[in-house]
Amino acid sequence: MNPIYLDYQATTPLAPEAADAMRPWLEDKFANPHSPHRLGREAAAAVEAAREEVLAALNPPPAHVERSRDTGSLYFTSGATEALNWALKGALTRLPPERRRIVTLATEHAAVLDSVEWLGRMGAELDILPVGPDGLIDLDLAAGRITDRTGMVAAMLVNNEIGVIQPIAELAGLARARGALFLCDAVQGFGRVPLPLAACDLVAVSAHKVHGPKGVGALWVREGVELEPLLHGGGQEGGLRSGTLSPALCAGFGAAAKLMLNRREEDHRHAERLWAMALAPLGAGWELNGSALYRYRGNLNIRRRGVDPARLMADVRRVAFSAGSACASGSGRPSHVLRAIGLKDAEARSSIRLGFGRYTTEDELVTALTLIDAAAERQLDPAI
């Protein structure tokens, strides 16, 4: 029987169009895009074409900001982890000491929280804001904590664990009113929910979360925002991000972004259909983690008292999904996101995350949820 993939928040299947765009640059068109000869210039042209495709997807109509070099620039990176590290460390380094105060949320990705913690050890002042049981930030609370001494506010568009959509435009407005930079981790929301690019100063995205290849991401930087380089060496990407770019990875990212832009309405409708039918195959006892209203519809993070997710995954090997409580290190500690929304350790440890999207069929989703529910029933009642 074919496996059923329901782990779209971890990574997405590579789009055939992205694979096709990459293939020539993995075979005979192998030149270094930073070389001055003809083959190098061809590779460089492919990188620049991909850059424009990602920019177009970041800033789609109708909420269109004029896409020009003087509005903002897109820099390719090895992924969103690098982009977020660079944005935080590169921007804070350029701020005066009295503005080196960072405000972020307790539910952010480890790439943000660990970077912020490191900056704290380097002397920055940190303020990590709590969220409510629904996973959303209280804007009144945020308004009181973002002060004239705040240099950076960082928040993700869509949470990678519970799919909650934060009010990014409002948070960015609070930051701008105080003269602070605003960094948006748009990895999970890019192309799926509206991104208020005009309100942001820095935006991080990743290719493999939008049906592109792993190993490439990007950081969008508004004109006038100064960053210290994170990587030093050959001076690529305008001297701000050293390292030889892969034309293949960039081309794959560009093709995936272009496809995402062209399919955005179709993909949105498909995710809504899947979400509408997702809860029906589950029996009583399952509870949703995070807001149901302010949520990306391709994420289902649920819990059931007494269920062991590790055993569940072993019993339902046909379905690829995630345990909602395992931290990145694999230590078995409950997820910081689930703890931040007020779940007890036992509740967090009985949570699972199901992610679905473009290539998930309705039959696959129903089959997977039925198998998971039946396995949970067997766990809780061995007599079944």
Predicted segments, located by residue:
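Pyridoxal 5′-phosphate
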Residues: M1-I384
